[in-house]
Each structure stands twice: as structure tokens, then as C-alpha cells.
Amino acid sequence: MSRFWSPFVKDLVPYVPGEQPKLARLVKLNTNENPYGPSPKALEAMRGELNDNLRLYPDPNGDRLKQAVAEYYGVTTGQVFVGNGSDEVLAHIFHGLFQHGGPLLFPDISYSFYPVYCGLYGIPFEPVALDEQFQIRVEDYQKPNAGIIFPNPNAPTGCLLPLQAIEQLLQANRDSVVVVDEAYIDFGGQTAISLVDRYDNLLVTQTLSKSRSLAGLRVGLAVGHPDLIEALERIKNSFNSYPLDRMAIVGAAAAFEDQAYFEATCRKVIDSREALVEQLTAKGFEVLPSAANFIFARHPQEDAAQLAARLREQGVIVRHFKQQRIAQFLRITIGTPEMNQALIDALS
């Protein structure tokens, strides 16, 4: 702590990101990265930007990427916001749409950045307990609030809330912004973007870090009513007018345009997930239903923290959370078949 800090800084509880180990031989199943590389067309597009134009600022609006997203989802560019990773997009949402005095609602087991944003922006919040099966109960969100946000599929559980239930939640909260954080939606869910034309209080966020294999590029987006998008643009242009560099804009746009590669890699991850669930179940693990590129599992005879430590000793890294309700679970990223087999071998 320094005497130069602003008073609020000492009270912040920052987000703790997943470990990024430097040892190349480790099997990394802890941060939900895609085990398959980016679209070759995305790489080609980015290489095309390695020229003298790097002396120029990028398009502050990211219009090429907005157009690609709009065409992909059948919306207008005025319904699309793009930013430097979905975490930045979420930060702008918290800053611009959730500061209304009342409590923000989100699941008690959820993305751990949500309470961090609340602390940063002084937003009161109320965690809403998942049920015994770690599912969201829509009826629990039918109470006064200043906004609602939840991941779908949820993180770190991987459980999916059906589109019909999301619509029920929207109908019950017409005067609140409802944000559906769809970082993992492409691995088994149906996007809520299909609802944005019917609900002016709906905002859907996505990332290119997972299903499009561009975690190192830092690109995120939001789709919603133009009034909500305008609020995010106002926040962005009061903070950083150029959040995406020239390579990020063209690379992300090309990734959206390469539908065949996207579908093929998602299919491989889904198939590997189902195979890994079967293998872990055979070893006595309880695995929650997952629509994500990870699974959430526990073993009735193993302490999760100790198991994670023993796996690391054998060169396999998974994610353990200390939160009491899930302290006996491990979150395991879906890797290639070879990476998943390394996990099974280590468990054996």
C-alpha cells in the first residue's frame, strides 16, 4: 500500500486469473482455452495487416468486425458493440447500465469477476443461490433489482439455462437490464441474440477467446437494443476510443466469416467433452451436465484441492476454486483427445 493511492484502492479485491504456466510440457486444462488454433483465414487476414498501415490508428468503431457480427446473427450494426475482450465489454456494462442504487442480481456460483466489478464501481449486489443441482431458478430473480447478469452456460458449472427460461426472466424484469454472458454458448447452447429484437432490456455478450480460438487477441462483443449499445459507446469513448487494434479487427471479422472452420472445431470439442465425461464417470466422478468447453466434476472419495495438486505433480493443470459450496469440484478444460488422455492417465 502506498500513500499515493486513492482511498478506494485499498479496499478493492481484484480478480485472480487462471495460471498461465511457463513450462511448455504441462498439459494445460485450467483456463478454458480452445485446444485448436484460430481459423487459417483469420491468421491470413492478420498477416495482411503487418504493413506500413500500422503507423495509422485503427478504426475506432471497428466497423468491419461489427458488420461481420451483424451479418452472422442477422442484426444491424447499430445493435453491436465491440471491445478489447468481453471483460472490457462487461466492465463498460457494469459502469454504464447497473448503477441505479438497487442490488445487481447474479448467481452465487458464477463468474468471479462480477463482484470485482461491483467493488470497482460501487454497485450493491445480491448473490442468488443456485438450486441443489447448480441450476438457475428463474423465479428467484423476480424481486426488486437494478439489473441481472449471469453466464450461460454458467461458469464454472457449465450448466445451461434454456432459451425459454431466459425469456421468462426477461418478461418478469421488463424494467431492468438483463445481461446474458455467452462466453461458452457455442459448445452446446442456443444464443439469446434471437431475442434482442423483442426485448429492449436484453444485452448479450460474447467473446472470441473460446469457440473462435482467439484468447490471445482480446476481442469481445455485445448485441442488444441500440439504446443500450449507445450507452456502451459513450462509456468506451470516455475511456479508450481505440480498444481494438488493426489486426484484431480483421482477424476477428475473418473468424466470424469462416463458418466451416468454426463448426468443425466446436464439433471436435463437443465430441471430446462427451468422451471425457464417460471416462471420468467410469472412474467414479460426478460430472455436472455441461454445455461448455469444460466440465465441473468431483469424486466422492477425493479431496479436490489435493487431487489438483497431485495432478499438477504429474504435469496436468486443472482449476480448483476455494469457494465453500464448490470446494470439492474441479473445473477441467476440454483439450484434444491426447490432452484428455493425459488427464486420465494421471488419474490412473
Curated annotation (Swiss-Prot):
Q: What is this protein called?
A: Histidinol-phosphate aminotransferase
**Catalytic activity annotated for this protein?**
L-histidinol phosphate + 2-oxoglutarate = 3-(imidazol-4-yl)-2-oxopropyl phosphate + L-glutamate
Keyword Amino-acid biosynthesis recorded? yes
Q: Belongs to which family?
A: Belongs to the class-II pyridoxal-phosphate-dependent aminotransferase family. Histidinol-phosphate aminotransferase subfamily.
Example of a GO biological process term: L-histidine biosynthetic process
Q: Which UniProt keywords apply?
A: Amino-acid biosynthesis, Aminotransferase, Histidine biosynthesis, Pyridoxal phosphate, Transferase
Establish whether keyword Amino-acid biosynthesis is in the entry. yes
Record-linked NCBIfam families: hisC
